[in-house]
Amino acid sequence: MTGDELRSAFLRFFEKKGHKILPSASLIPDDPQLLFTVAGMVPFKPIFWGKVEPVYTRVTTCQKCLRTNDIENVGRTPRHQTFFEMLGNFSFGDYFKKEAIIWAWEFVTEVLKLEKDRLWITVYEEDEESFKIWKDIVGVCEKKIIRMGKDTNFWGPAGPTGPCGPCSEIHYDTGLNEDCSDGECTPANSDKRFLEIWNLVFTEFYQDEKGALYPLPRKNIDTGAGLERVASVVQKVESNFETDIFKPIISKIEDVLGVEYKKDEQKDISIRVIADHSRAVSFLIADGVFPSNEERGYVLRRILRRAVRHGVLLGAQKPFLHLINETVIEHMGNTYSELKNRKDLILEVTRAEEERFFKTISQGNEMLRDIISRSSKVIDGEDVFKLYDTYGFPPDIVVDVAKDYNLKVDLEGFEKLMKIQRERARSARNNVEYAKSQEIYDELAQKSKTVFVGYDTLECEAKVIFLKKSGTKYEAVFDKTSFYAERGGQVSDVGQIVWDGGSASVEHVFIPVEGIIVHIINVEKGELKEGTKVRLIVDREKRLSTARNHTATHLLHAALRKVLGTHVKQAGSLVTPEKLRFDFTHHKPLTDNELMSIENMVNEIILRSIPVITEEKSYKEAVAEGAIALFGEKYGDVVRVVKVHSFSEELCGGTHVKNTGNIGLFRIVSESAISSGTRRIEAITGFNTLNYLRVKEQLVGNICEKLGTSQDEILSKIENLIEKNINLQKELQQFKSKLLVSQLKQTPFEQIKNIRFVHCVFNDIESNELRNLSDIAVAGENSTVALLFSTSKDKVNLIVRVTQDLAKKIKAGDIAKYAAQILEGGGGGRPDFAQAGGKDPSKINSVIEYTRKLLEQN
């Protein structure tokens, strides 16, 4: 049975048991507590919590999942993976333990035809009900039902809070010989021999942030069986990587990198890492994640670069992973159409990140080799930080390389140095106050909703339904509002609230849970209470400016796709009253002609004064008509579509102008890279464009005045000044060089026996200048040793020269290595030429004295 056949058999089996087959959800969960979908139940958490009523009470899925908590084990064990597929069947208040257990046994014994005598069961030690079902109804021998503790047989939650419950696992006896200290081998004492193939979770509790358990409104079933793991049992192979799921990928790796699997265990580790990581990279990019230095993007970058690093260990000298990804897409694209639909994007982003990392490797490897050469047992955290800060060299790769040299890495020291950079938005995810606030709004959403009327009006009458003090401000919820909440990259409205005897300013608006709109307000006068009737007034000018920029963002997106190609996808955006910022997937900088074409195209649509149409329709209908849906966004059955004739059509809940002519004028002010494969354009519209052009015009006028020229002559004037400056710089450099040579020649040398010893200290000169001076120091001389230093406040560089007649007995490289120790740095080189560097210029005399004694001994 192939992996594809196994997947299909599982889904069809449960379909016959009354389950609805649902497609896999995205790897990007709609859950603020999780970076990725880590289990099959994640998409159903709101149902398990009792917050959302299920459309179907019985569901079965094959869910794509990603976990990186054990990434260092991937490739080193037969089972560990980052990306995997989770087979699962779910019941939402329908059947419970009895049916789940009976059906699981039926599937593994009758469909998969696994030998019953090889199957063992574990149950939670306090779950007597499950024990009896396995023993009395299914008929499993009592000695093969093992009671286990909470650490192994109580599942969840998937995050700090959430649904959880006892679980029962099916284990397969692989028959491997293993000494078990407790007597007979069982799943309780033998991880290697017994392979867990299916976990049946009986979800009946909710765990809060303190760890307290509360019964859920309904009892649920959540089961999970790793497709790759089950396939290894069915196909009777020792490793997930030997199944037909991985074979085409490993075969491609062999072809591309010229290696052979199962010939060398160290190489096999790297092959397995690449095979696993290529799947993770392909699916992450397909689901809208792009390499970056934070959150999901950082995880993708880490996985991708780890795969490349293992490719380098196998001899790769140029980008190769995108070629492996092609096989992933070909092999899995029929099951997961997003791979084929986004093939070009996956390959382009992968290749661009590979190219960037190969540059990083070549720069960082030299520094890493130097670090390893002077590290006896531990690589210092400061060195790891320098590698990351200077070259973007990932710390996990330093750890991998360190293992090859039996070195440890001071990751704790690295983390301390990284603290400032790492204090990002993720801290909010684990914030207890944030979790408490979420619970409050979850409860409020069960009783009340905020109706948004802001598409049609900027002012409305409303009633306060919830009020909470938050520092010096308040969080206020109304039964309806005209204020747009921050969402989809658009900032929230601001404005005023007035009521009888009072007023407040609205500073920010957000949506903590669906249906609740929270206003951050500053009470300026009077007292506001729950139940108070108020009037909400949106700042008209800021709303209109934001609307101009939002519609312009849609036009920019469409123009980018028309000029650059349909591989362009939105990777992020920010829409404010002042400007718009649009991040998109593209592998190289835009040319001046491309930018001009895009800008002209957008302005042409603006000048044509085309109506901007907004309408609601079904999601399927909108997508079928060609409307662009953004990766990672969650859409309901009914969506809002914003359309500009045949030029642009997107699913969007933001605010827009009624007519493109209302935008006025569109101007791109910058284009840059924010990460490999992702570009950013910033632009302005309306009066902001006019003000921008006025400032530019005034700046040009001021420059002309300073240079005493006209706008027509300004370019030639500047070119003349640049040429003069270059000539003056050359003259100045020549003068400086003469001074340095003069300083060197005027420095008296020491005669030690028959050896001419030259040593001279210069103040903060370039390394190439120091090298030139060292050439002069030994030019036309024999029996000469020269030490030339360049110092700055906390840095010293040294060049050591030894003439050829002395180089066999006095080696420049040895002097440099010793000098590096004294100067607290690193160094080395050839017998006739060597360099060293350090951070303690005060030790220069010690280096000179050491060399003097060395010469006296020869």
From Swiss-Prot:
Predominant subcellular localization, coarse grouping: cytoplasm
SUPFAM superfamilies: Class II aaRS and biotin synthetases, Putative anticodon-binding domain of alanyl-tRNA synthetase (AlaRS), ThrRS/AlaRS common domain, Translation proteins
Keyword check for Metal-binding: yes
InterPro entries in the record: aa-tRNA-synth_II/BPL/LPL, Ala-tRNA-lgiase_IIc, Ala-tRNA-ligase_IIc_anticod-bd, Ala-tRNA-synth_IIc_core, Ala-tRNA-synth_IIc_N, Ala-tRNA_ligase, Ala_tRNA_ligase_euk/bac, DHHA1_dom
UniProt keywords, alphabetically: Aminoacyl-tRNA synthetase, ATP-binding, Cytoplasm, Ligase, Metal-binding, Nucleotide-binding, Protein biosynthesis, RNA-binding, tRNA-binding, Zinc
Record GO cellular component, one term: cytosol
E.C. number(s) listed in UniProt: 6.1.1.7
CC cofactor: Zn(2+)
Subcellular locations according to the entry: Cytoplasm
Function field: Catalyzes the attachment of alanine to tRNA(Ala) in a two-step reaction: alanine is first activated by ATP to form Ala-AMP and then transferred to the acceptor end of tRNA(Ala). Also edits incorrectly charged Ser-tRNA(Ala) and Gly-tRNA(Ala) via its editing domain.
Family statement: Belongs to the class-II aminoacyl-tRNA synthetase family.
UniProt note: domains: Consists of three domains; the N-terminal catalytic domain, the editing domain and the C-terminal C-Ala domain. The editing domain removes incorrectly charged amino acids, while the C-Ala domain, along with tRNA(Ala), serves as a bridge to cooperatively bring together the editing and aminoacylation centers thus stimulating deacylation of misacylated tRNAs.
Name assigned to this protein: Alanine--tRNA ligase
Organism encoding this protein: Pseudothermotoga lettingae (strain ATCC BAA-301 / DSM 14385 / NBRC 107922 / TMO) (Thermotoga lettingae)
